């Protein structure tokens, strides 16, 4: 399953929208990343703190699983709690659990997309819980091909950024259309991560397959952001 990255202003707007499942964390979703800071209890955080002294917070992990059997979506929607199914709008059952807080999109083919995990372990645990729910409804569901497709992170550099200057100097990688989307879209090549950079200093990173790519991308962009700091 392919997950398109937000590389245009309209895609970025959709990505940051309140109703977006890809980035479901923003209280002021339209134009700025969340203020949430990294959980100091996360063992990964201290060892990933680079030159910037800032560690992006993981906001959403998107994973896919193959349950390896055909599913009757009407039956699932009828008997499972916190499940909705409106085939005219979307060809999957949308199911939610509270612990770990997440959302699953369950397709008749047996393919499942799980969103909302804040860590790789949470994502896998949630995916297993959904598979177990399907099994309890009488389907011969297995848990195969678990794969993390996208990791979304965010952080705040705590200083304003001159987006026009950044877009001009890094035109090959940047797209900035403030009348369509308030952030600059920066397409990093290595690691292959897309960054949404806001004038306030808030940053959203997406497209990573492993959390290290989020950290690497931020450390790579930080000197550039410092260069275009508004004084």
Swiss-Prot record:
One function term, GO molecular function aspect: RNA polymerase III type 3 promoter sequence-specific DNA binding
Gene Ontology biological-process annotations: DNA-templated transcription initiation; transcription initiation at RNA polymerase I promoter; transcription initiation at RNA polymerase II promoter; transcription initiation at RNA polymerase III promoter
Subcellular location per the Swiss-Prot or TrEMBL entry: Nucleus
Ranges in a coiled coil: none
Any one Pfam family match given in the protein's UniProt record, by short name: TBP
GO CC annotation: nucleus; RNA polymerase I transcription regulator complex; transcription factor TFIID complex; transcription factor TFIIIB complex
InterPro entries (UniProt xref): TBP (IPR000814), TBP_CS (IPR030491), TBP_dom_sf (IPR012295), TBP_eukaryotic (IPR033710)
PANTHER family: TATA-BOX BINDING PROTEIN
Family statement: Belongs to the TBP family.
Protein's name in the database: TATA-box-binding protein
Organism whose genome encodes this protein: Schizosaccharomyces pombe (strain 972 / ATCC 24843)
Gene coding for it: tbp1
């Amino acid at each position: 399953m392919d997950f398109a990255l937000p590389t245009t202003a309209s895609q970025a707007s959709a990505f940051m929208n309140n109703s977006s499942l890809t980035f479901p964390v923003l209280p002021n979703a339209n134009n700025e990343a969340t203020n949430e800071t990294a959980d100091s209890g996360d063992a990964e955080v201290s060892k990933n703190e680079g030159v910037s002294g800032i560690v992006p917070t993981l906001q959403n992990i998107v994973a896919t699983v193959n349950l390896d059997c055909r599913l009757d979506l009407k039956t699932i929607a009828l008997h499972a709690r916190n499940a909705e199914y409106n085939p005219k709008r979307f060809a999957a059952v949308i199911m939610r659990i509270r612990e770990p807080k997440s959302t699953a999109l369950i397709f008749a083919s047996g393919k499942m997309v799980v969103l909302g995990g804040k860590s790789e372990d949470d994502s896998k645990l949630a995916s297993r819980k959904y598979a177990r729910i399907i099994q309890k409804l009488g389907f011969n569901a297995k848990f195969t091909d678990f794969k993390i497709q996208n990791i979304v992170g965010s952080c705040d550099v705590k200083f304003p950024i001159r987006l026009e200057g950044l877009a001009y100097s890094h035109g090959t990688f940047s797209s900035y259309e403030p009348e369509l989307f308030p952030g600059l879209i920066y397409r990093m090549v290595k690691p292959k991560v897309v960054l949404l950079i806001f004038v306030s200093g808030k940053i959203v990173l997406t497209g990573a397959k492993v959390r290290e790519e989020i950290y690497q991308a931020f450390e790579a962009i930080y000197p550039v952001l410092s260069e275009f700091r508004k004084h």
